[in-house]
C-alpha cells in the first residue's frame, strides 16, 4: 500500500523528502527552493541579524542547502547566548567566564558562570587531536578545538540528564526548593585564523556548529604565521582577507540554518607584520624607508647567506638593521620631506587634513596628493624593509586596532581587540569609538593570565571592579581564557608538594576537606560521574539486578552520607 501524502505540518524539506521520487523533479523542488529563499530572507530581517551585512543573497544560500532539513543544538545555544548578551549589554553588565579544559571544570563552573569558553591555547598545550601538545602557534590539526567542544558539549548533556533524573525522584515540594543548575551553557570557542583558506574556514565553522559551539572567534593573523596574542612575531592579514573569513563562517552557518555567533578578533594592537599590502585600508599603517641609500633587507640577508654567513651572524645583522633603520609611514615620510623643502605648516596641515578625511586613501593617491605640495617626489619604499618571508612592517597600536574593529563590525556579532595590558581608560576609549558608529555592538575582553595583574597598580577595589567598569563601556563578554589551566596547575602544585611530605594528611587538608566545605559535588565522584543515573537505566531494562548495581551495598561513597 502506498504511503499517505506528507503532512502539511512538516517543514517543507521534510515534506519534500517523503514525496515519491517521481514527484520530486520540477514543481516540487521549485516550491521547496522558493520556500527556502523566503524563509532565509525573513530570518535575516529578524532582530537577530540587525546591522549584519552579507555580500551574498538568500538565493546563494538556498541553492547550497540541499533538500534536507537539519536542526542543530548549537543554534539553540546561540540564540540563548544572543539573548543573554542583548540583556546584559542593555544594562551595561558583564557576562564573565573562565576557560575550561575538561568536564570536571565545566561542571564546577556551570552553577556560577553563564557561558563556557574553550581556548585554542589550552587545547594546543593540553589536548590536541594528535596528542602532540605544543605552544599556541595555530599549527595543531583544525579539528582539535571542535573535538574539545564536542567533548564538553556531550559532558554538559550527560550532567543535564543526570540532574533531570535526580529531580524526577523528588517530590514537587522538594523540586521547588532545590536549586536548578543549567549545565547547558552556551559554548564559545577559539577558531584561531580559520586554519587555512576560505574552504577551510567553511569546514571548520561547520564542524564547530555540528559539535556544539554557540559562538566562535576568528583572528586576523596569518595562517602559518599565527602566534598567541601575547607573543611577539605575529603576522596580520589584510583587512579584507579577514572580512572574507568572517563571511565564510557566516555563510556556512546560513547554509546550515543555524544562528551561531561570529566573533571578529584583531591582533593589530601588537601585530607588527602584515602579509600583504594589497588592501588600501591598511596603507596608512604600513611602514617603509624614507632613505634611498638603505639597501633592501631581504636581498642583503640572501647575499650574506650565499657568501656563507652563519645563522647567528644573519640574525645579529637583521636585528641591528631593524633597530638602526628608521621605519615610517608614507604620511610621516611626506611630512618630513615637506619640512625639508620648507613647505609651510599650513600646507602640511592641509595634506594631513585630507588624509585624515579619507583614511582609506591608497598609497598611489597619497603620493599624488603629496606631489601637490612638494617640488620633488617623496621617497618612500615599503619593500626595502620586508622580511625574508616577504612580510611588510606594520604600525601596530590601538589606532590600527580600532580601525580594524570598525571595519569588521558589520560582519560580526561581537568584536574582540587583543590588548597588551589591562587598562580601563584604554578599554573605554576603544568601546566608545566602536559603539559611536555601531550602537549596541558588544565587545569581548580577554582578562588574560598573560598579564601580570599584580604589577599594574590596581587597588584591591579597582581589581575587583575592573570587569564591571569596562562592562559599562560595552565589553559585555569577558573571559579569563586560561583560568582552567592555571587553576589545575595551582592546586596540583600545592598538593604534590605537600603529599610528598605529609601523605594522606595533605590530601585530606588540601582536597577532601575543602571539597566538603565548598559543597563540591566531586567529593562523591561516583555519583558525580553518573553511576546512579546509569544504574537507573540498567534497572529499567533488566529487573532482578540489584546485587550488581554500582551504587548498591559495598559502594564506599556511603561513608560520606
Curated annotation (Swiss-Prot):
Pfam families named among the record's database cross-references: ICL (PF00463)
Region (Disordered): 154-177
Catalytic activity: (2S,3R)-3-hydroxybutane-1,2,3-tricarboxylate = pyruvate + succinate
SUPFAM superfamilies recorded: Phosphoenolpyruvate/pyruvate domain
Catalytic residues in the record: 228
Signal peptide region: none
Name of protein: 2-methylisocitrate lyase, mitochondrial
Family: Belongs to the isocitrate lyase/PEP mutase superfamily. Isocitrate lyase family.
Subcellular location(s) of the protein: Mitochondrion matrix
Organism for this UniProt entry: Hypocrea atroviridis (strain ATCC 20476 / IMI 206040)
Amino acid at each position: 500500500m502506498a504511503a499517505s501524502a506528507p503532512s502539511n505540518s512538516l517543514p517543507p524539506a521534510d515534506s519534500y523528502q517523503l514525496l515519491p521520487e517521481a514527484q520530486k523533479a520540477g514543481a516540487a523542488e521549485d516550491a521547496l527552493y522558493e520556500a527556502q529563499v523566503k524563509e532565509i530572507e525573513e530570518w535575516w530581517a529578524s532582530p537577530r541579524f540587525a546591522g549584519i551585512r552579507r555580500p551574498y543573497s538568500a538565493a546563494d544560500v538556498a541553492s547550497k542547502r540541499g533538500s534536507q532539513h537539519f536542526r542543530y543544538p548549537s543554534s539553540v545555544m546561540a540564540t540563548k547566548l544572543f539573548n543573554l548578551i542583548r540583556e546584559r549589554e542593555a544594562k551595561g553588565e558583564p557576562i564573565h567566564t573562565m576557560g575550561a579544559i575538561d568536564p570536571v571544570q565545566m561542571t564546577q563552573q556551570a552553577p556560577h558562570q553563564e557561558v563556557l569558553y574553550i581556548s585554542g591555547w589550552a587545547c594546543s598545550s593540553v589536548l590536541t587531536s594528535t596528542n602532540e601538545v605544543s605552544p599556541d602557534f595555530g599549527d595543531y590539526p583544525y579539528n582539535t578545538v571542535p573535538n574539545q567542544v564536542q567533548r564538553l558539549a556531550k559532558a554538559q548533556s550527560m550532567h543535564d540528564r543526570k540532574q533531570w533524573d535526580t529531580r524526577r525522584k523528588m517530590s514537587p515540594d522538594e523540586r521547588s526548593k532545590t536549586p536548578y543548575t543549567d549545565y547547558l551553557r552556551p559554548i564559545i570557542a577559539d577558531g584561531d585564523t580559520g586554519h587555512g583558506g576560505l574552504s577551510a574556514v567553511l569546514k571548520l565553522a561547520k564542524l564547530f556548529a555540528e559539535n556544539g559551539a554557540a559562538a566562535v572567534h576568528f583572528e586576523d593573523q596569518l595562517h602559518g604565521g599565527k602566534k598567541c596574542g601575547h607573543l611577539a612575531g605575529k603576522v596580520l592579514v589584510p583587512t579584507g582577507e579577514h572580512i572574507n573569513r568572517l563571511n565564510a563562517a557566516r555563510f556556512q552557518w546560513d547554509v546550515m540554518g543555524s544562528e551561531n555567533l561570529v566573533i571578529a578578533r584583531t591582533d593589530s594592537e601588537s601585530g607588527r607584520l602584515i602579509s600583504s599590502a594589497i588592501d588600501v585600508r591598511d596603507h596608512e599603517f604600513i611602514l617603509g624607508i624614507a632613505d634611498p641609500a638603505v639597501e633592501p633587507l631581504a636581498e642583503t640577508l640572501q647575499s650574506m647567506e650565499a657568501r656563507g654567513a652563519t645563522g647567528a651572524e644573519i640574525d645579529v645583522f637583521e636585528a641591528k638593521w631593524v633597530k638602526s633603520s628608521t621605519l615610517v609611514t608614507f604620511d610621516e615620510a611626506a611630512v618630513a620631506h615637506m619640512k625639508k623643502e620648507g613647505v609651510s605648516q599650513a600646507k602640511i596641515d592641509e595634506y594631513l587634513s585630507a588624509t585624515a578625511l579619507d583614511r582609506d586613501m591608497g598609497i598611489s593617491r597619497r603620493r599624488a596628493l603629496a606631489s601637490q605640495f612638494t617640488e620633488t617626489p617623496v621617497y618612500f619604499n615599503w619593500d626595502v624593509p620586508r622580511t625574508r618571508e616577504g612580510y611588510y612592517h606594520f604600525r601596530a597600536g590601538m589606532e590600527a586596532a580600532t580601525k580594524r574593529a570598525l571595519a569588521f563590525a558589520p560582519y560580526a556579532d561581537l568584536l574582540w581587540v587583543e590588548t597588551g595590558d589591562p587598562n580601563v581608560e584604554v578599554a573605554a576609549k576603544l568601546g566608545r569609538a566602536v559603539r559611536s558608529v555601531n550602537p549596541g555592538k558588544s565587545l569581548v575582553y580577554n582578562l588574560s593570565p598573560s598579564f601580570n595583574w599584580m604589577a599594574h597598580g590596581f587597588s584591591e577595589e579597582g581589581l575587583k571592579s575592573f570587569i564591571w567598569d569596562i562592562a559599562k563601556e560595552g565589553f559585555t563578554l569577558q573571559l579569563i581564557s586560561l583560568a582552567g589551566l592555571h587553576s589545575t596547575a595551582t592546586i596540583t602544585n600545592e598538593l604534590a608538594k605537600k603529599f610528598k611530605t605529609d601523605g594522606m594528611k595533605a590530601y585530606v587538608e588540601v582536597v577532601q576537606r575543602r571539597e566538603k566545605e565548598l559543597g563540591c559535588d566531586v567529593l562523591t565522584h561516583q555519583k558525580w560521574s553518573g553511576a546512579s543515573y546509569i544504574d537507573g537505566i540498567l534497572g529499567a531494562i533488566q529487573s532482578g539486578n540489584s546485587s550488581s548495581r554500582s551504587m548498591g551495598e559495598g559502594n564506599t561513597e556511603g561513608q560520606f552520607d
